[in-house]
Regions:
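Hydrophobic, small-residue-rich alpha-helical packing segments that form membrane-like cores
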Residues: 295-329, 338-349
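Trp/Gly-enriched beta-strand surface patches
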Residues: 1-76, 592
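Acidic/polar loop patches that form or flank catalytic/metal-binding clefts of enzymes
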Residues: 206-209, 335-337, 349-362, 409-418, ...
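Short, surface-exposed recognition loops and adjoining beta-strand edges that mediate ligand/DNA contacts
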Residues: 349-392
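Substrate-binding groove/exosite segments of carbohydrate-active enzymes
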Residues: 48-51, 57-71, 78, 82-83, ...
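Non-catalytic C-terminal accessory modules of carbohydrate-active enzymes
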Residues: 442-448, 464, 468, 475-603, ...
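Alpha-helical scaffold segments in carbohydrate-active enzymes
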Residues: 271-282, 322-325, 342-353, 422-429, ...
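Beta-strand elements of well-folded, non-transmembrane domains
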Residues: 86-90, 577-579
């Protein structure tokens, strides 16, 4: 127990050192005063004499060193295991500021000793379930580099990047620095990219949507892209991000589809409409409601883009399509029709005006008048930190999300394909030895990667800040888009380049940083598993689908997970954890009704066609 610390201090809490091993257990709760390391010497003299600790009569140090020992006799050629556990409970977590918001786990356990009492008896079960997950995943047919990228980045969900409030809401930094969190508020335009949380922990993903729509959103529909804490403060401020806000609408659709939870959708539908309608505010992102974002659009590049561009444009198209589908489900016919009209207008306009024959570009407008600026004119008329004619690595991020959500193409299919080819052509660099980067270096020397932006048609004098960098979350987004376009070889080249950089020798293989270690966007790597397997699941329609390519595919929908084994004319769907509602299984272009309407852990069904 922390006796010398105020009970409201973040350092106040409990730690327990315990063992589950059998044998002669001994301990001491204090040590000799630690002058010139005498405490360690005193411990060693005690322990080395006979392997048994002797309790001291009273603590003699303000910082006493406790010790725990287990004594066993090991026979020749035999093996013995000694198991020790360190448990803790520190309830006074700070949020993004000095305010104490608390920890969810502290509501589940009174102190560190109760953690030990309740968790240690479950360790065998937890280890078995964890190993089942890992072994099943590793036994799938995905390329080794994809399995590594997807699995290793799950470490972010067990890092200090994320935490849960006492209410159960999952919150996240963008990443973490060595001693503090980086970029607070479950930043929407960063967390938009990751796919691990919704497809592995659907309930937690729903809590993030609850924060975004019901705490961080103001009455006029402005969603703060960084939610302050405590949650009662989340809507303070006026910081909206066009990509973050539109992406949250798509995520709401995704969570509804994966869960099939109509109550969840009904509860949030009013807020979804409000959040989308904010884009139609006079002089806002799409103030004239023509399906095109001409206004000032703050985004994940930490700047404002002025004028129509593919990054925000396709997020907007995806939000319109997602809102249309949710509106039909809520029997909101007029809103559904409006979303469809704006989608068709906006999609057609971007294909006609932003697609330059190779990729989609940014048409810059005057920040004051919203009038288009002559891009061939003087640079001094062009606002700083824009994209312009650059080829952006994640210009199709909205399409990335749309594919995963099953919302179809947001633009001309041929244009989308050509754009992915151009991103590989212009942004992939096989050797960075001669590359100049005025910002942070996440790649160097002879390493390879996808540039944030390339400029085959001429660079702006002052482009957006990160244009010369390479960041893995964006690379995964592009690679997944390539997979959906049938460019699997190119996609694997990009993913392999990432993992070659994070190989455990040059960099930490379990932490792919941007602004901080264990960066949330790197969990976009999980989407490569979804794309390669052709996986899509709708709990609303009770249908799951996979590619027709023979193989063994790990799948997860956020509430259950298992394997699907596909061969010529036959597929076996197996649930290893959770419960799956299923009525139809689609393999390639073939859809077959299942005999069972529900599969629980340990059950499977084989279909033939």
């Amino acid at each position: 127990y922390s006796e010398g610390v105020d009970k409201q201090d973040p350092a106040w809490g409990t730690i327990a050192l315990v063992t589950s091993s059998t044998g002669q257990v001994s301990y001491r709760t204090s040590s000799k005063a630690d002058s010139w390391n005498n405490a360690i010497l005193n411990f060693w003299d005690d322990f080395s004499e006979d392997g048994v600790m002797v309790e001291r009569e009273q603590p003699s140090d303000e910082d006493p060193m406790a010790s725990l020992a287990v004594k066993k006799t090991i026979a020749p050629q035999a093996t013995e295991t000694f198991v020790f556990y360190l448990t803790w409970n520190f309830p006074n977590r700070k949020g993004w500021s000095s305010t104490i918001v608390g920890n969810y786990y502290s509501r589940q356990f009174a102190d560190a000793w109760e953690v030990a009492e309740k968790v240690i008896p479950r360790m065998k079960q937890l280890e078995e379930e964890t190993l089942l997950f890992v072994r099943s995943f590793l036994n799938s047919s995905y390329p080794e580099t994809v399995k590594e990228a997807a699995l290793f980045n799950l470490a972010t969900l067990r890092s200090q990047t994320v935490f849960r409030l006492p209410s159960g809401h999952l919150m996240g930094w963008e990443g973490i620095m060595d001693r503090f969190g980086s970029c607070q508020g479950s930043c929407t335009h960063v967390w938009n990219y990751e796919m691990a949380t919704p497809f592995l922990f659907g309930g937690l993903a729903q809590t993030m949507r609850d924060v975004e729509f019901n705490y961080a959103t103001k009455e006029n529909g402005l969603m703060n892209f960084r939610a302050d804490l405590p949650l009662s403060e989340a809507a303070k401020g006026n910081s909206a991000a066009a990509d973050g806000q539109m992406g949250c609408i798509m995520k709401m659709y995704r969570e509804w589809q994966l869960s099939g939870d109509y109550a969840f959708l009904r509860k949030n539908w009013g807020q979804v409409k409000k959040v989308l309608s904010y884009a139609w505010t006079e002089k806002g992102w799409d103030g004239n409601q023509d399906g095109v974002m001409e206004g000032s659009q703050h985004n994940t590049m930490d700047v404002n883009y002025f004028g129509p561009n593919p990054q925000m444009g396709f997020w907007y198209m995806g939000a319109l399509r997602a809102a249309e589908e949710m509106a039909w489900a809520m029997k909101d016919k007029s809103f559904a029709k409006k979303c469809r009209r704006l989608f068709e207008q906006g999609s057609r306009w971007m294909d006609e005006h932003l697609f330059n024959g190779e990729y989609y570009e940014h048409h810059i407008t005057d920040p004051e008048t919203f009038e288009f600026i002559n891009m061939e004119g003087a640079d001094d008329k062009i606002p700083a930190f824009q994209l312009g004619k650059g080829c952006l690595v994640d210009q199709l991020v909205g399409q990335y999300m749309a594919h995963i959500c099953g919302l179809g193409y947001l633009g001309d299919k041929k244009h989308i394909h050509t754009t992915m080819e151009s991103i590989m052509k212009y942004n992939y660099v096989s050797d960075f030895s001669r590359h100049f980067n005025n910002m942070r270096s996440y790649v160097m020397g002879e390493e390879a990667g996808l540039l944030m932006a390339s400029w085959p048609k001429g660079r702006l004098e002052v482009p957006f800040p990160y244009f010369a960098e390479v960041m893995t979350g964006f690379e995964y987004c592009a690679a997944v888009g390539m997979i959906y376009e049938g460019m699997t070889d190119e996609a694997l080249t990009c993913i392999r380049s990432i993992r070659d950089r994070f190989d455990g020798a040059k960099r930490n293989p379990f932490s792919e940083p941007e602004c901080g270690h264990h960066y949330a966007r790197s969990m976009a790597s999980w989407a490569s598993v979804i794309a390669l397997s052709g996986f899509h699941y709708s709990a609303v329609d009770k249908q799951m689908q996979f590619t027709s390519a023979p193989g063994t595919y790990f799948w997860s929908n956020g509430y259950a997970w298992g394997m699907c084994r596909i061969s010529d004319g036959e597929a076996t769907l197996e649930v290893l954890r959770g419960t799956l509602g299923i009525e139809r299984l689609r393999i390639g272009d073939v859809t077959v009704k299942t005999k069972k309407k529900q599969l629980t852990a340990g059950e499977s069904e084989t279909i033939k066609w």
